[in-house]
Amino acid sequence: ERMLKRISFQTAYSLGENLAATCLDLAWHKISEEEVPSPYMAGAFEKEELHNIGLLNTQIPPRYSTSYFNHVWGGGYAAGYYSYLWTEVLAVNIADYFAKHGALDPAVGQAFRDKILSRGNTKDQMEMFTDFTGMEKPDASGFLKARGL
């Protein structure tokens, strides 16, 4: 039981780090050019944003601080760090769909191929998700369960 609690704590802490990084990434991209703080005030901006969302931990510095968090600044990932967690939520929901409807059923596999895989980036991802699962939006509870929370 103690071991399971420890695993849950580590998982929750890791998710907190990812959520903090996601929110920090989005915070930098939602402000106007005039609101961008000077480089000397970037740390204060970061602390204020993390405090406002309840993810500021004064004892442990953030894993992804603004000064070295490359996803914030470019490489095709700007304001996109959230996509790591979001795709995990979608993947868990799709896995649940397979589990409920027969993971080895050829018709289910063909529907997945036709409604998601063959579409690539030609259709909105949420439309493809809804077309396949019948769900208007993903359920986060499966994601949390998969994370042991």
Name these PLM-found stretches.
Residues E1-L149:
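Cation-handling catalytic/transport regions enriched in His/Asp/Glu
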